[in-house]
Structure formats: structure tokens, C-alpha cells
Regions:
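N-terminal pre-domain/capping segments
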Residues: 1-126, 195, 199, 274, ...
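Active-site acidic/histidine proton-transfer and metal-coordination neighborhood
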Residues: 6-12, 82-86, 101-202, 298
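Active-site beta-loop-alpha junctions enriched in small/polar residues
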Residues: 28-33, 60-62, 95-98, 134-136, ...
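Charged helix-capping and loop-helix junction motifs
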Residues: 39-41, 71-77, 107-115, 145-156, ...
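Acidic/histidine-rich catalytic cores of soluble enzymes
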Residues: 56, 93, 156-261, 266, ...
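Short beta-strand segments at enzyme active-site cores
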Residues: 57-60, 90-95, 127-134, 170-173, ...
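Surface-exposed, active-site-proximal loop segments in enzymatic domains
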Residues: 63-73, 96-113, 135-148, 215, ...
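A short, acidic, flexible beta-alpha connecting loop/helix-capping segment that sits on the rim
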Residues: 285-306
């Protein structure tokens, strides 16, 4: 087992004895974008995360990282054991659903994929499954917008119900590069799905590009005067998972949000966390998301103490206001 980084003191419990959010690193940072041609294998990534002191990893389900359909009962048990041997837990799973956009494929096809994902996650002791709409921002072309929206709601309701049986949450990561990327659309959808184990994956970079720049929203973008901070306050009650990274409003390949090292962008993290408030404090995990960042190998090392400080100072502020 690799030695864990021990150079920084850690707060692991609050005064009332409850745990604080643990910090994970997303594995897609080493397989997408600048790493796509020479992706790190998953074992190398896990060793890096452990060596640098992360509490856990968030699994990118895109090959060559663990794809749920590639595993048997024996091999999934071995994968879980190898991750645990490094002292790491798993914060969530982001499956590869590119061929099954939920508003466009037959519902049975999407639900079949979700059954495989649920089986994999149950074996891996993963309680959070990340999804998106897959469809481009312009919306589905094969069917009317209203019909597509109704199908999306039905499919995610049924998916959430299936995951609930195993104690799992389904979280939607809204972002500029996919359909339903306006603040009002995001709020409406999560309320229309209306399942207790369905919620939002709030990514600080996507929130910034969406609220402050109206990225890929089309004509008459829906901007929020308070940017990502106002967006956080608007969605706080629906947030079930959190990705933190900086943003300057730019897009990767004119598609979706660039993810910049902390301090290289415009996000006011203390204000954003304060706007999220109690829901953020009660999350089990905060995940560092370096998707598409060419300097990840260096900057993900530097990010961990920054995020720890943000977390600990945020919890101190919450405690000082009487919130536990």
C-alpha cells in the first residue's frame, strides 16, 4: 500500500461528532481532452490519488477506465479490493451513456443500461450515479420537444426508482454542452422528476459559464446577476453532489466548460459554498474535477490543500452561525 500524504492536518469530524465532506478526485481528468490519446490507466490514476492524499476517487465509466459492462462478479470484487488497498473510497460513478440519450432512445434500452450500472455500483459500494441529457443543446431532433421532455422525465423517474431499491442516488450534471442548460430549465426538470433520490450534481465551472455567460444557451441567454453564487442559492435544496473547479467562462473546443486550476478563474468559492449552505455541508463527498485540463498532474496535487481549506473554513462559518 502506498503511503498517504500526511503533511496537512485534517478535520475529520465536527464538534457534534458528525463527519465532514470527504474529498475525491475524478478519474476522467486523466483520460479526456489532452489525455485522450494517451490516457492513464485506472490503476495509475488511483495510485496518484492515494499518494497525494485524496480520500477517494470518482470513477469515469468511459473505457479504458472501468465500464460497468466489462466486469464479472469476480473482477468487480477484485477492482473494489485494489481501490480499497490504497486507502481510497469511491465517491460516485459516471457511466458511459453516450449511445443512449434518455430522451431519444427507447425507454427499455436506457433502463437496461441503468440496470447494469446499478449492479456494478452495488458491487462496488457506490451510492451516487451521475447522468446528463447526452443530447446537444439545440434539443432532440427525432421527436417534438414536448414529447422528448416527457420521456426524459419518465426515464429518470424510473431510473431513480430502480436505484432507490439499492440505496443509490441519481444525480444530473447540467452543463452548457447538453440540452436543458438554462437556469430555469434546470430548476424545472429536477422538480418535475420529483424523486427523493434524484438531484443535481452542481459543478462550479458549469454553474459559472451558464449563469454568468449564458454559454450555449442560444439567443437571449438567461443570465443571473449574481452569477454562480446566485445559481447556487437557487438550486441549493436540490444539490446532492458537488464538483469543484475554477472557470473563466471559456469553453473547451466551444463545447462545454473549461475546468481551470483553482485561482486561475473567476469563481468566488467561499461565496458559492455559503450560498449552497447546509446541503453542501451535509454532503458525504466533494469532488475535484479537472476535466480537459492539461496541467492536471501538477495542479491536482496543489488543489487538495486548497479544497480542504475551503471546506474547513466553510464549516467554521456555518458553525459560527449556529448551523451544524
Amino acid at each position: 500500500m502506498l503511503d498517504r500524504a500526511l503533511d496537512a492536518p485534517r478535520i475529520t469530524t465536527r464538534l457534534d461528532g458528525s463527519g465532514v465532506p470527504k474529498i475525491a478526485l475524478g478519474s476522467w481528468a486523466f483520460s479526456f481532452g489532452p489525455f485522450e490519446k494517451e490516457p492513464w490507466d485506472f490503476e495509475r490514476f488511483c495510485e496518484y490519488a492515494a499518494r497525494n492524499g485524496y480520500d477517494g476517487v470518482e470513477i469515469n465509466g468511459f473505457r479504458p477506465h472501468p465500464h460497468d459492462e466489462d466486469f464479472t462478479a469476480t473482477s468487480v470484487a477484485d477492482l473494489r479490493s485494489r481501490i480499497g488497498a490504497l486507502g481510497l473510497e469511491i465517491s460516485g460513478y459516471a457511466p458511459d451513456l453516450r449511445t443512449t440519450p434518455p430522451a431519444e432512445v427507447p425507454e427499455a434500452v436506457y433502463l437496461g443500461r441503468m440496470a447494469s450500472i446499478a449492479q456494478f455500483c452495488q458491487a462496488m459500494d457506490v451510492s451516487t450515479v451521475r447522468v446528463d441529457t447526452i443530447t446537444r443543446p439545440e434539443g432532440p431532433s427525432a421527436m417534438g420537444g414536448g414529447d422528448a421532455y416527457r420521456q426524459l422525465i419518465r426515464v429518470w423517474q424510473r431510473s431513480a426508482d430502480a436505484l432507490a431499491a439499492s440505496g443509490m442516488d441519481l444525480v444530473w450534471e447540467f452543463e452548457p454542452g447538453f440540452w436543458l442548460n438554462r437556469p430555469s430549465q434546470v430548476k424545472r426538470l429536477v422538480e418535475d422528476v420529483g424523486r427523493p433520490n434524484f438531484g443535481l450534481l452542481f459543478d462550479s465551472s458549469h454553474a459559472h459559464t451558464g449563469a454568468a455567460y449564458g454559454a450555449r444557451q442560444g439567443p437571449n441567454p438567461e443570465l443571473l446577476d449574481g452569477g454562480a453564487v446566485e445559481y447556487a442559492a437557487m438550486l441549493a435544496d436540490n444539490v446532492r453532489h458537488l464538483h469543484l473547479i475554477d472557470s473563466d467562462g471559456s469553453l473547451h473546443d466551444d463545447d462545454t466548460s473549461d475546468h481551470l486550476p483553482f485561482g486561475a478563474g473567476e469563481v468566488d468559492f467561499p461565496a458559492l459554498l455559503d450560498a449552497l449552505g447546509v446541503p453542501a455541508a451535509r454532503l458525504e463527498w466533494w469532488t475535484v474535477d479537472f476535466c480537459f485540463c492539461p496541467t492536471t498532474e501538477c495542479d491536482a496535487t496543489l488543489a487538495l490543500p486548497i479544497v480542504r481549506d475551503l471546506r474547513d473554513q466553510f464549516l467554521d462559518r456555518m458553525s459560527n452561525t449556529g448551523v451544524k
